[in-house]
Curated annotation (Swiss-Prot):
Designated name of the protein: Phosphoglycolate phosphatase
Organism classification: Bacteria, Pseudomonadati, Pseudomonadota, Alphaproteobacteria, Rhodobacterales
Catalytic machinery residues: D8
This enzyme's EC code(s): 3.1.3.18
Keyword field: Calvin cycle, Carbohydrate metabolism, Hydrolase, Magnesium, Metal-binding
Organism: Rhodobacter capsulatus
GO cellular component terms given for this protein: cytosol
């Protein structure tokens, strides 16, 4: 029986940093703060919208837990849902997902991005029909690296075996916490050297992913 595949979103299936960069700077400019560079914004991505807002506030010289947090968070999430043009697929994603679906792999996305913005980004890049389930950063009481999202995805997908596919330090820890093999996409938002992150397999081109899954040996 083909395994369940549980994917991260940002930095794994889609390059969302340009979209997040634009939305974040729109929020900052609306309040008179200086815009930030793409690399700096990219370094804030992966731990959810609350973390991103705290980073923006800190960089702007404001209290990250202060009275501005709620308003900026609400503005950011609202813009996230409609300003999706900067989200793009990594090369080869659609072809790989088509092959994985043909192999009988049920698939889910677990992301720290809020649920509605995640759905909007997924729809924009044409991924909606490939996934049985999407769990966002505000869908459950916890976010990754807590394994609750992944455990819920496994419950819904109902397969005895599963792989977790992501790109970052958070993803490596999530897979470890969930007790799943971690397959890392090396072209995402990882900051740590690859050899320093525990992983069971790696790929830099999505054309390799179906072969990795098909050849997996389960102990």
């Amino acid at each position: 029986m083909a395994p369940a595949l549980i994917f991260d979103l940002d930095g794994t299936l889609i390059d969302s940093a340009p979209a997040i960069h634009k939305v974040s700077n729109d929020v900052l400019r609306a309040r008179g703060y200086a815009p930030l560079g793409l690399d700096q914004i990219r370094s804030f991505v992966g731990q959810g919208a609350p973390h991103l807002v705290r980073c923006l506030l800190t960089t702007a010289g404001e209290d990250p837990e202060g009275p501005l947090f709620d308003a900026i968070y609400a503005d950011l999430v609202s813009r996230y849902e409609t300003d999706v043009e900067g989200n793009t697929l990594y090369p080869g994603v659609i072809t790989a997902l088509q092959r994985l679906r043909e192999m009988g792999c049920p698939m889910a996305i677990t992301t720290n991005k809020p649920y509605k913005p995640a759905l909007a980004a997924i729809a924009h890049v044409g991924l909606t029909d490939y996934f049985q389930l999407v769990i966002g950063g505000d869908s459950l009481p916890t976010r990754k690296p807590n394994p609750e999202m992944v455990n819920e995805a496994r419950r819904v997908l109902r397969r005895p075996h599963a792989l977790y596919i992501g790109d970052s330090e958070i993803d490596a820890q999530t897979a470890q916490n969930a007790g799943l093999p971690f397959v890392i996409y090396t072209e995402g938002y990882r900051k740590t050297p690859l050899d320093a992150l525990p992983h069971a397999a790696k790929f830099h081109d999505f054309s390799a992913l179906p072969g990795i899954v098909e050849g997996w040996t389960w102990s």
